[in-house]
Amino acid sequence: MAVFVGLLGLSGMPRADEPLPQAFAVPAGVNHNTFMVAGDSITAAGSRKVAVGHVGEASWVRYVNTPGTPATLAWTGGWALGGAQSGDMAVALRAGSADSLVILAGTNDLAHGNSHTMIGENLARIARIVRAPMVLLSSIPPRDDAVAATVAYNEFLKTFAGERGWTYVDASAGLRSEANTFIEGLSDDGVHPNVEGAKILGAAIGQALTTKPMQAIADTAGVEPLG
């Protein structure tokens, strides 16, 4: 277990702490859908400075906007760190507001044997911290050495999101083979997406943020987020 838990941290991930070009800066005169994040190494991708606007090269956050088109999504805050469990996110995430809150959590919880019930309680706590009309809960990527647990957890997330009135997106679908492992070439360690995998994950999350969320924002203006 200790070896596996270590793998879920920063092992095999880029160490670059480069700023995302649009991080925490929404260009004037352009309509953007803003989002905050709560996550682990799949979001941080080696960075320890996500809270101040830095993610690694293999973070999905970099790839939510369609290449070659005007950016419509702006990342404006949140927290993520390699090895983080959902409870860590609920403690470390700071209050804020955005059009959407994207939560991608649970890989490390599964490694530590946390129950779905415990994780669900932490996810609800996370959602209460950020004022966002849209809570977008994403599936977690495959884990090649824990296929059954990952499949069951993603099913739990889908059901949980529906019960809370959140939006669920199976953003990891494009990473998954028929055997529910990583498609070859999309991960270097069977746990974390590499850059090519992050592009697929980010595109799926970006699509979810630019379709359903905008209608949800219009429908729920002034409504407190569910928690």
Residue ranges and their predicted role:
Residues 31-34, 71-75, 97-101, 107, ...:
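Loop/turn elements at helix/coil->beta-strand transitions in domains of secreted/extracellular proteins
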Residues 56, 60, 85, 89, ...:
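Stable alpha-helical elements in mature extracytoplasmic
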Residues 38-42, 79-84, 104-108, 138-143, ...:
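Active-site-proximal beta-strand/loop segments in catalytic clefts of secreted hydrolases
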Residues 143-227:
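Catalytic His-Asp segment of secreted/periplasmic serine-dependent ester chemistry enzymes
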Residues 10-79, 90-97:
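Serine-esterase "nucleophile elbow" of acetyl-processing enzymes
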Residues 1-9:
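Hydrophobic membrane-insertion alpha-helices, especially the h-region
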Residues 107-108, 126-154:
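Active-site segments of SGNH/GDSL-like serine hydrolases
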Residues 84-120, 140-143:
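Oxyanion-hole/transition-state-stabilizing segment in secreted/luminal serine hydrolases
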